[in-house]
Amino acid sequence: MSRKYFGTDGIRGRVGEYPITPDFMLKLGWAAGMAFRKQGHCRVLVGKDTRISGYMFESALEAGLSAAGADVMLLGPMPTPAIAYLTRTFHAEAGIVISASHNPHDDNGIKFFSGQGTKLPDEVELMIEELLDQPMTVVESGKLGKVSRINDAAGRYIEFCKSSVPSSTSFEGLKLVVDCAHGATYKVAPSVFRELGADVTVLHAQPDGLNINEGCGSTHIESLQAAVLVGHADLGIAFDGDGDRVLMVDHTGAIVDGDELLFIIARDLQEHGKLQGGVVGTLMSNLGLELALKDLDIPFVRAKVGDRYVMAELLEREWLVGGENSGHVVCCNHTTTGDAIIAALQVLMALKRRGETLAQARQALRKCPQVLINVRFGASKVDPLEHPAVKEASAKVTEALAGRGRVLLRKSGTEPLVRVMVEGEDESQVRAHAEALAKLVGEVCV
């Protein structure tokens, strides 16, 4: 059964456009409360990033959950992985995150976590969708949910992050620049690194509700590159708006993406006898990651794009490390979801143990040229991925790459985009193929 509202990472869209409206969020809170209450007493944590619309949707969800008889614990602005962690430690039935991750402020969305701090199973999301189609009812007044606020949430999460590295760890002498994207990490991330001894310069940590991800963070890394170079820092760390993605910049200003961070973490775990199994990437992971891991005899498998699918593959195989090149990195020995701060700490720990700079560590992975072009499609009824001309062109490019590259066409799970990716050994050839395919996809979408 297909899902009506839930995409690969919850529900997301433009604020004020259905379903990202206060009335829908009220009903969603009620439906979620009813679904979680089927197991008896229900307690739900609610957190958000720094978007101005988060306050509006927080109130709507709170009312809906209470109407269903669910108790609500408000966290305020907190990173998405912090909400997963706190949901677990408070033994709540579920956690709800109000965020649109790396999107601009005029988007927002909802993510759910189970009581174990993992993304909800598909069957629970389908149950919530079925309840959304039913009339909303209110429990009798004596059974209405109560609302409280967790005032020490940030401190709890900071201590948890620090516990992911050995207690004797000190990053004294390490000069960092940290870009918080005016988002949910703006308070906790600087504290974590400073309390571990690093010299931290903070960028973009003055959220006003409208500036989240605006020209900053992991999707706009230019200002971090400049700050690292000007300040002669050892490296820079860029988070996205909700703190589940991380990219880095080495001391030369070069960007270090999720594939490279994943390799550094996996190699460190292997060298210390702590790598359980192999590594999970996605269909978008660079071929160079697969080859570099193969050189170390580390198994590598590809999941569908989306950290929920990476996590599912890790759990099924009982492996520890996986992620996406966009910067979602999951370390199952510490977390139940992608956690940007935890991932950054594991990279810093790996560098410290090897006595390497970030620039040196990334040299062990030789990335293949990869060109990704996003093609926006509107109300066209044509499925570009099923169009005969697109299929034929894709097959021809695959044949031309002669087993030394890949072609991937897929729809985004969160935006009206077709992602055209071509990967191979010759960058000019790869770019030409990607541009030709993207042009064709755009034409059939009209």
Swiss-Prot record:
Protein name, entry field: Phosphoglucosamine mutase
Q: What is its EC number?
A: 5.4.2.10
Q: Which PROSITE patterns match?
A: PGM_PMM (PS00710)
What NCBIfam families does the record tag this protein with?
glmM (TIGR01455), PRK10887.1 (NF008139)
Name a GO molecular-function annotation.
phosphomannomutase activity
Q: How is it modified after translation?
A: Activated by phosphorylation.
State the HAMAP family in the record.
Answer: GlmM_B
Reading the lineage from the top rank, the first entry is: Bacteria
Q: Which family does it belong to?
A: Belongs to the phosphohexose mutase family.
Write down how the cofactor binds this protein.
Answer: Binds 1 Mg(2+) ion per subunit.
For whether the record's keyword set contains Magnesium, the answer is yes
User: Which catalytic residues are annotated?
Assistant: S101 (phosphoserine intermediate)
The enzyme's first-digit EC class, named in words, is isomerase
Q: What does the function comment of this entry state?
A: Catalyzes the conversion of glucosamine-6-phosphate to glucosamine-1-phosphate.
Residues holding Mg(2+): S101, D240, D242, D244
What Gene Ontology cellular component terms go with this record? cytosol
Question: Could you give a single Gene Ontology term from the biological process aspect?
Answer: UDP-N-acetylglucosamine biosynthetic process
Key words of the record: Isomerase, Magnesium, Metal-binding, Phosphoprotein
Q: Which reaction equations make up its catalytic activity? A: alpha-D-glucosamine 1-phosphate = D-glucosamine 6-phosphate
Q: Which cofactor does it need?
A: Mg(2+)
Positions carrying Phosphoserine are S101
* Signal sequence bounds: none
Name the InterPro entries for this protein: A-D-PHexomutase_a/b/a-I, A-D-PHexomutase_a/b/a-I/II/III, A-D-PHexomutase_a/b/a-II, A-D-PHexomutase_a/b/a-III, A-D-PHexomutase_C, A-D-PHexomutase_C_sf, A-D-PHexomutase_CS, Alpha-D-phosphohexomutase_SF
Q: Does the keyword Isomerase apply?
A: yes
